[in-house]
Amino acid sequence: MSSTMAGVLPWGFTSSSNCVHTQQLGPSHHRTAPFSLGSNARAWYKIGMMNPVRNVVIVGGGTAGWLTAGVIAARHQGRIKADTFSVTLIESPNVPIIGVGEGTWPTLRSTLEKIGVSETDLFRHCDAAFKQGAKFAGWTTGAADDAYYHPLMLPQGFTQVNLAPHWLAGSNGQSFCDAVTPQGALCDDGLAPKMITTPEYQAVANYAYHLDAGKFAPFLQKHCTSKLGVRHVLADVQTVNQRENGDIESVTTQQAGVIAGDLFVDCTGFRSLLLGGALGVPFKDCNDVLFCDTALAMQVPYDTPDAPMASHTISTAHSAGWTWDIGLPTRRGTGYVYSSRHISDDEAEAELRRYVGPAAKGLTPRKISIRSGHRETFWKNNVVAVGLAAGFLEPLESSAIVLIELSAKLIAEQMPANRGVMDIIAARFNDVNQYRWGRIIDFLKLHYVLTRRPEKFWQDNLDPASIPARLQNLLHLWKYQPPWFFDEFDRIEEVFPAASYQYVLYGMGFRTEVAEADNDNTRTMAAGFLNEAMNLTKRLRAQLPSNRDLVKKIHDYGLQPI
């Protein structure tokens, strides 16, 4: 049992003398029950066990709300069709979507497939394109040739041998990414990760998506309501109605009256109307670790309709932050994420315009405030937060949507049978998400701590006080052994595997002093995988179409259904 679950009883009671009674074995050796609930606790426990969870109410739409609705509804389709379970989403007609164009993680492919979405339809209706990773330019020194890839493919033979020490022993000037995977070369060439004959959701090279968040949410809404039986209510929530124990009983809306539920999912964005507002769960700020607190977003048209379209996100370092550059079929989504403590808004806009070039003329950027961090608790009473209501981190590694997916899947799979067991599931959910958010913060910070850039923003990121202790310990360890499974990366809760850390570390010039301890068999195996990566690179460069060509063919002909 985890430390956070110890002593937790249903309905939030803890094992204090008021509600738990324990007796020792007496002289007569008659064994009593280990504990018993007090009369009030027993009453609440029985009430909880008699209250099944049948009605899930999601407050808030957008990607978080509709993706969560889809995952839960797909998982419980049998009950929805039998009319013993319902998913209702309440969405304000007056609140705009925050999304500025999204990068995603490969998990979205399996998520969309499981809820029954056609990949062809995704491309046709969401201005979607392929994403094979991220290119980080200027993060180490700022020199013209300073760039590395964090691809979405694992190194060849990743589950059998760690190629990092063998690359370190004799890289011959070849980057780690190019030595162990073909994906950096595919991105350099602007190639797609599959062919038109590759079935939906299948891959030649691992991939995620770039997509328009403003189109993605309505696309999910249509699918959820027409195919999965999700009830859609367009209304503004005016009042949150709570029971004596703090549970939310219902919400009162302006247009649709009172809507009751057994489990409420807070997808109300930064304001966190239910978890942060009604239940008062505090926000845990991490701006002392991740300094960027503002973004300027700009949608940039292509010079020509058939202009090359990058199959990777481009993250370019600047004086006080970094720009994102996402290629969609009809435009580029760009923006500058920066620290307002290190640069003014006007100076940041000037840097963004210099990066975009002449195409920025006449375009007005949209300013977005960023508060990096998360709620201290993600699930309290009968309320669980997903998406921005749970927290937000700068979009450096496309973690926003994958966190929505993982939370939605966990809620769907662990859906409480009744209120009596909900607190047990909530404790598990909180443990998993505390770990995930902490590790993502570590991974994002890793991108900043190996820099040699001279600007104050970058130098401030090297302050040990801003580097989490776990990351400091791992950096010390990695001086002598490369990241691998035994650095806790075998946990199911991990979002970024050991390979992701390798790509960033060695892409930024980190050196590991590896002792030559591998036997001949391991060296032979590693040499074979490195040679395999080289041959695969040659073959795929000759076979795969360009990113834009494949997206156009998908629009014209569609992908083959599985």
Please place each PLM-identified region on the residue numbering.
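Conserved FAD/dinucleotide-binding core of flavoprotein oxidoreductases
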Residues: A317-S369, G391-V402, Q414, M422
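N-terminal Rossmann-like FAD-binding beta1-loop-alpha1 element of flavoenzymes
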Residues: R54-D83
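Short FAD-binding loop at a beta-strand-to-alpha-helix junction that anchors the flavin cofactor
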Residues: F378-L396
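Long, low-complexity C-terminal extensions of enzymes
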Residues: E413-I562
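Glycine-rich FAD pyrophosphate-binding loop
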Residues: A74-V100
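Low-acidity, Ser/Thr- and Arg-rich intrinsically disordered low-complexity segments
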Residues: S2-T4, W11, S15-C19, S28
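Predominantly flavin-linked oxidoreductase catalytic cores and closely associated redox partners
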Residues: Y201-G321, G327-G335, S339-A348, A408
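Dinucleotide-binding Rossmann-like beta1-alpha1 core, especially the glycine-rich loop
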Residues: P96-C187
